[in-house]
Every structure is written in structure tokens, then in C-alpha cells.
């Protein structure tokens, strides 16, 4: 995914890549095969959907992996502090995010703010994904594609109405 801002043109961009690896517990050193130069600069952030703090105004008990239990899969709640090393099945979602904001004097602050925002966004999204398991588990590929098409249609409609403001997946 590549995001740009029309006003800032080439002075602002966010690029992110994602790779899901079944059976991985986060041990792959370079899952997305980035260059040695980028490896030296990267900052690895581990997201723990059960134990990472989220802003209190975003907290919903029904989206808390420490409280959620899937009726369909039997997964959850994630109450063991070491759940990441014990649960089965397991998958790691490796994400690589490049943030570039070229504006003298505030570049570092804006990039740092955006990195924290992206971390919060990914944490909230993956908490929701886990806690909504019973809504999507067992869907066929055709049902998923239909849901994607409906979501795209709804987003396009909102985009045509004006600015999209979303704090979580339910807002979209």
C-alpha cells in the first residue's frame, strides 16, 4: 500500500507491506526481504494484541482479546502473559512501514507521531480481527470477496460524500 498527500506531493509518503506466515511466532529476521541498508535502519516493534495498551477512549470489552472467546473455534481468551508462545494454531503478520515526511524543522516529530499512530492502528485492527473471529470464520472465498466488494462500495460512497473519518473498522 502506498499513500501520498496531494498537498505535500513528493514530500510525504507512507508505504507499507504485509506478509502473513503460518506457524511463525515472529522469529523470521527478514521476512519481507528488505535490503541490508534498510535492515540497519529498521526499528522492530512487536505488537501484542492481548497485552499492549490502547487509548482508553478506544477500549471496548467486546474487542479485548483477554476477554473474548470464539464459539466457532474455541480460541481465546488470551489470558496467559506468554500466550504468543503457547497458542495453536499461530500466524505472524509481518509489516514493514516506510514513513517519509520531508519538511525541515518538524520532520522527526511528524515521522515519530505517524509511527506511533500506525502502531496504535495496527494494534486496534488486529485486536478487532481476533475478537470478530465468529463473524468471519468459515466464510467461503466468494463470501469474503462479496464482503470486500460491499466494503469498497460503502467506502467509495463515503468518499464521494466528503472526508472519511475513521477511528476503527466499524466506522468504515
Regions found by a protein language model. Name each.
Residues 1-172:
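Eukaryotic helix-grip
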Amino acid at each position: 500500500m502506498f499513500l501520498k498527500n496531494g498537498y505535500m506531493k513528493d514530500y510525504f509518503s507512507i508505504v507499507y507491506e504485509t506478509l502473513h506466515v503460518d506457524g511463525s511466532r515472529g522469529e523470521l529476521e527478514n521476512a519481507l526481504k528488505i535490503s541490508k541498508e534498510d535492515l540497519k535502519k529498521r526499528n522492530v516493534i512487536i505488537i501484542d494484541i492481548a497485552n499492549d495498551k490502547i487509548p482508553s477512549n478506544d477500549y471496548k470489552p467486546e474487542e479485548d482479546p483477554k476477554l473474548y472467546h470464539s464459539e466457532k473455534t474455541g480460541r481465546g481468551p488470551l489470558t496467559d502473559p506468554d500466550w504468543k508462545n503457547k497458542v495453536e494454531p499461530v500466524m505472524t503478520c509481518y509489516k514493514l512501514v516506510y514513513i517519509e515526511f520531508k519538511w525541515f524543522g518538524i520532520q522527526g516529530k511528524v515521522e515519530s507521531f505517524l509511527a506511533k499512530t500506525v502502531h496504535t492502528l495496527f494494534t486496534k485492527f488486529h485486536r478487532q480481527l481476533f475478537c470478530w473471529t465468529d463473524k468471519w470464520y468459515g466464510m467461503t472465498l466468494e463470501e469474503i470477496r462479496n464482503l470486500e466488494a460491499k466494503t469498497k462500495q460503502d467506502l467509495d460512497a463515503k468518499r464521494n460524500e466528503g472526508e472519511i473519518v475513521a477511528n476503527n473498522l466499524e466506522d468504515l
